[in-house]
Amino acid sequence: MLLQNFSNTIFLLCLFFTLLSATKPLNLTLPHQHPSPDSVALHVIRSVNESLARRQLSSPSSSSSSSSSSSSSSCRTGNPIDDCWRCSDADWSTNRQRLADCSIGFGHGTLGGKNGKIYVVTDSSDNNPTNPTPGTLRYGVIQEEPLWIVFSSNMLIRLKQELIINSYKTLDGRGSAVHITGNGCLTLQYVQHIIIHNLHIYDCKPSAGFEKRGRSDGDGISIFGSQKIWVDHCSMSHCTDGLIDAVMGSTAITISNNYFTHHDEVMLLGHDDNYAPDTGMQVTIAFNHFGQGLVQRMPRCRRGYIHVVNNDFTEWKMYAIGGSGNPTINSQGNRYSAPSDPSAKEVTKRVDSKDDGEWSNWNWRTEGDLMENGAFFVASGEGMSSMYSKASSVDPKAASLVDQLTRNAGVFGGPRDDQGQSGNSYSPYGGDGGGGGSSGGSSGGGMDVMGGTTRGSSSSSGDDSNVFQMIFGSDAPSRPRLTLLFSLLMISVLSLSTLLL
């Protein structure tokens, strides 16, 4: 009997260690979480510096080149995203999907509907959320296949319920003035590879829910358990909850070139200090204009790594950047202009923290930021990690260039929207990259095949493609399955029981 128990124990222990080695390395990383976030921040800074250098080299004062070169120089602003898609040889409207090659930061590589069909929105109605009409925006976003969604004309879309968007979709408002408002607005839940570009989003209200869904919060854009998300060149204001909220293990996000006005709680990144997966949240916030009538949360962070770079903060009433739960905040090359209220000069706020003993080890960094009207940033934590020391050897461009880098923030080519919306009007795109009005698809509300490449291939990569392939390798191990963890636990219990017999 003793020999049999001993044999069973040996068998169970062997099985235990075999399964344990199969799960090695055991980790809880999020999909698309980058193993070295400081290296991503470094690459963003390099991209800005290189784009500004190219602009300088191509300027008429430094070159006597051809008219095409002069045209390119008039297009370039030094903003690496805009220079990528606006300043190529071809008109952007003939190659809309080049936009997918132009993201930077943690959202780099977001495909959206790249290499998918073009879907043209011709119907601005939202009469039947449960069975949407072909030609409506809702019909396009619920399709399973990759789609590049464009709009046939200027339109105001009043949503009756939240707009739930499936993976591999691009909402491309270029060439038309597209306004989205109403109940729920945009919801990205457990999806990947979404690009939201050049839309007015405002006055979003909570929706009662439909089918089996509960009540929505009234966010402009709600990102829930999703990865590879890029929000670019949107104008947002006047929503019930947040303008952009990212929670529940969302990561690999870039929020760039947007124009935010007239709102209280602007941006939430992480919903609970105790939600451990949000430690893997990684967000780049770049080239945005935080304008009139904003109060707080630009952003408000929990856990994770947030890179705030070359933004223009022109107004806040409480604070600009807040956090709890030990997030890493890397602020570089921003302009912070404090309000006149002497009690609101501090850029930062450690939310719900009683004393500095609680947050003194949080890594909140400031480098190259411009502080105006008495603004000040309270840094904390380690001076620099080894990688961050390396990153700091590449200076972030001075905040004095923020005007230049954010000059086109918000809906591109439209009027600056200091009142929160600008009506259903459209101003043609300026510069050499413009070609207003082209929808890029058929006039009908259906789908038009575009190209013959497959999803995931790159038709027009930039000069930095090799670097990005190196930085954004897919070497992160997969998450362990709960069934496997439960099996390990049961084997341990059985082993212990056998030993005690």
Curated annotation (Swiss-Prot):
This is Probable pectate lyase 13. It is a lipid-anchor; GPI-anchor. Residues 1-22 form the signal peptide. GO terms for biological process: cell wall modification involved in multidimensional cell growth; defense response to other organism; pectin catabolic process. Ca(2+) binds at residues 217, 241, 245. The gene is PMR6. Its EC number is 4.2.2.2. Residues 430-449 have a biased composition (Gly residues).
